[in-house]
């Protein structure tokens, strides 16, 4: 079930960052960021994901304050989590 405060793909910030809740539907190959091959880039291993916010596959993201992103998602700001 999608939480009420989940980022929608029509959200202005989501549009600007090319966010998709399903990384496979995103432009991550064309816009791949350094750190991992494009097919391994998703919100779950991004430094902006906030693991202490949300639950299950929906977590916080410092780029979307007060909203939740899907761990299987991707956006153009993806950056490999340190460690």
UniProtKB/Swiss-Prot annotation:
GO terms for biological process: aerobic electron transport chain. SUPFAM superfamilies: HIPIP (high potential iron protein). [4Fe-4S] cluster binds at residues 43, 46, 61, 75. InterPro entries: High_potential_FeS_prot, HIPIP_sf. Coiled coil: none annotated. It is found in: Periplasm. It holds the Pfam family HIPIP. GO terms for molecular function: 4 iron, 4 sulfur cluster binding; electron transfer activity; metal ion binding. Keywords: 4Fe-4S, Electron transport, Iron, Iron-sulfur, Metal-binding, Periplasm, Transport. One of its GO terms (cellular component) is periplasmic space. Specific class of high-redox-potential 4Fe-4S ferredoxins. Functions in anaerobic electron transport in most purple and in some other photosynthetic bacteria and in at least one genus (Paracoccus) of halophilic, denitrifying bacteria. Belongs to the high-potential iron-sulfur protein (HiPIP) family. Homodimer. This is High-potential iron-sulfur protein. It comes from Marichromatium gracile. The gene is hip.
